[in-house]
Amino acid sequence: MLDRLEGVEQRFLEVESLLSDPKIVGDQKVYQKYVREHADLSKVVEAYREYKQVLEGLEESKELLKDPDPDIKDLAKEEIDRLDKEQVRLEDELKILLLPKDPNDDKNVILEIRAGTGGDEAGLFAADLFRMYSRYAETRGWKVETLSEHLTGVGGIKEIAAMITGQGVYSAFKFESGTHRVQRVPVTEAQGRIHTSACTVAVLPEAEEVDIQIDPSEIRVDVYRSQGAGGQHVNTTDSAVRLTHLPTGVVVTCQDEKSQHKNKAKAMKVLRARLLDHAVQEQNASISAERKSQVGSGDRSERIRTYNYPQGRVTDHRIGLTLYKLESIMAGQISEIVDALTTHYNAEALQEGGL
């Protein structure tokens, strides 16, 4: 591990030097690439330098144990105890920092929520989930932009797609893909019986044009008039756009904007992300079940979480986490869940890597 850390520190110094090179500064695209690399490396280097100081401190304190003065010996023992704990903490931190980084972690995401079983109640729960994620994004300083939405007649959401932009968005949202189940008494239920409904969530990293090539001849473009929740036309021009990727059958619609051009641009963003996701899912399917992370599999059919309103309980089934904080979680305070999932995933990765 120490050899790897020395290599990281050397690369950090190289990048630091490159950032002061006038040629690099003059090319903003290249400059920004090195700025991002510098930021990533700095986390490892800071921890490594602190670790080296702790090792030096331990050596000095062990030397003081040879001192004839008993008071100095006692102080040295106390310092060794403290530094031993620091050494363990920093070694654990460095192991995680040295894990291979998910190349998508810093990407923006396209968040898709679809109402599943449960009729109108599933649509209302889909709207609740979207509010929860939107509020969480706001607390992190991220921007949420609706790309397309199909509303139900009772204030729910049949299907919604939104772009969430900011630093590290995918790293926080990537474990949210799957089936989310709700248990509660619907507002329409006169007998007070608890119903179970479900929604599926898909989190797709934003795909740049370089990530996936799409042949324009393989896309069928249909235009039509935008419709409201009840099916009525809300626009007098054919501004809504439906894109069909013929080889895969993936269909994307967008009708939120009044401009056909803007709707097509938004639909292309979603299509590109879905096609990249389609390729990744196919690749994951070829990986043996033993090697695929339970937390990070992103299986859409996997029931990942239950929100039980009568008990005020939220349970994440993948890691056995139960929190009796449903109200604050639905208000967007999901950091505790995100952190627990990340910790679990890191522990899995460390075990797999034999660290």
From Swiss-Prot:
Lineage of the organism: Bacteria, Pseudomonadati, Thermodesulfobacteriota, Desulfobacteria, Desulfobacterales
GO cellular component: a single term: cytoplasm
Keyword Cytoplasm (UniProt): yes
The protein's name: Peptide chain release factor 1
Family of the protein in this entry: Belongs to the prokaryotic/mitochondrial release factor family.
UniProt KW keywords: Cytoplasm, Methylation, Protein biosynthesis
Pfam families: PCRF (PF03462), RF-1 (PF00472)
Organism: Desulfatibacillum aliphaticivorans
Physiological role: Peptide chain release factor 1 directs the termination of translation in response to the peptide chain termination codons UAG and UAA.
PTM notes: Methylated by PrmC. Methylation increases the termination efficiency of RF1.
